[in-house]
Structure formats: C-alpha cells, structure tokens
C-alpha cells in the first residue's frame, strides 16, 4: 500500500485537512477535509498516485478528484474575500478547515479519531484531537486527498469567475500575481474579488525594495 496510507494507518483513525488559495491576490480560500472509511483493492491503483497536489499535473488532479469524491466522506468549504478581509487570510484558512472537518465528523459520526492538519498551525477553537503535519500533503493520504479537493475546487471557481472578469486571466493564473495579472490591475483597477489587504502588502513591499 502507498506509504501515505501507511502513515495514516499508523495514526489510527484519521481525517485530513488542507487548504488552497492562501497566496493569491484574488478569490476566496478553499479548505477540504477527507476521511477514507476503507480502501478497497480496486481503488488502490488510482489512489497510489496520491501526493502533494502541487506536484501533480492538472489532468492527474482532475482524475483523482473524482475518485476521492466518490470514495471518501469529504467536505469542501469556500471562505470568500469579504471574510478574508475581516479576519485575515490565516484565520480564514483555519476557519475553512475547521468547518470542513466538523462537517466530515458529523457525516461519518466519528469517535476516537485524530485530525491531521497540513502545515504548522493547529485549528483554533476546535474541540477534537489534532496535530499539524508540516508538508503533510506529501506524507498523509487524507491530507493529500484534501489538498486535491481544495485545489481543483478552487481552480474551477477561479475559471468561473474569469468568465465575469476575463481581463485578469484567472482561468490561467488562479488569482496569483503574475506579470499579466499585475498589468491588468494597472489597466482595469481592482474587481470585487480582489483582496485589498494582500495587494496593499505587496505594493508596500515593492515600494520598500525600490528604496535600496
């Protein structure tokens, strides 16, 4: 069996959670949680491909997305820009993971389990056992699966938003500040889906760099 599944098995009953979208200048942040009740033999071949979603091709993520959705208990949460601006991106990410985990726990009626959280922060105001796993999407099958659900869902969301605002190229850059995205902001200004706090920090940093 995949070493990522072995890692989960060594921790007992686990759910894994991850987010996508902390770094972009536009769009919400997505969080997902995954619980695999069992891994049937016919799924192992597909799920052996599980790894950090950023290392997989878009085609591989799409294929795994459907397998994960259909063979796990899962939840996907979107925290919108308005909420990000109110509570900051870190708190928004943790809130999304908390809500996703609580939904999975309720669906699966879990007891005596542990939550594996990708990164180096624990979920705040969370009443269940948890531990963070640095680079967990390359270590835990449940976290890797959650990473794929979050990233694919967010990419689709940004592609849909791009239909409304094609000038920013979100279907290609997913809201990250590429040169083309910055040029579009300079030409067209900000949309309602941009994150003002992120952009303020970016431009302040750029201004400081030009002083040296």
What do these predicted regions represent?
Residues 1-212:
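RNase H-like, Mg2+-dependent phosphodiesterase core
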């Amino acid at each position: 069996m995949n070493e990522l599944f072995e890692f989960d098995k060594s921790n007992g009953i686990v759910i894994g959670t991850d987010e996508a979208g902390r770094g972009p200048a536009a769009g919400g942040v997505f969080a997902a949680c995954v619980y695999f009740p069992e891994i049937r033999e016919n799924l192992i071949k597909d799920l052996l491909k599980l790894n950090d979603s950023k290392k997989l091709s878009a085609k591989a993520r799409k294929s795994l997305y459907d397998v994960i959705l259909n063979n796990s208990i899962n939840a996907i949460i979107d925290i919108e820009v308005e909420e990000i601006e109110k509570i900051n991106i870190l708190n928004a990410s943790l809130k999304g993971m908390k809500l996703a985990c609580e939904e999975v726990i309720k669906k699966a009626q879990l007891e005596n389990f542990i939550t594996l959280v990708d990164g180096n922060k624990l979920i705040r105001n969370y009443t269940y056992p948890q531990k963070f796993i640095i680079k967990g999407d390359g270590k835990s099958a449940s976290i890797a699966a959650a990473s794929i659900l979050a990233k694919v869902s967010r990419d689709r969301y940004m592609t849909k938003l791009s239909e409304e605002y094609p000038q920013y190229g979100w279907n290609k850059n997913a809201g990250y500040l590429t040169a083309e995205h910055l040029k579009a902001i300079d030409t067209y200004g900000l949309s309602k889906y941009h994150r003002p706090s992120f952009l303020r920090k970016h431009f302040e940093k750029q201004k400081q760099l030009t002083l040296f």
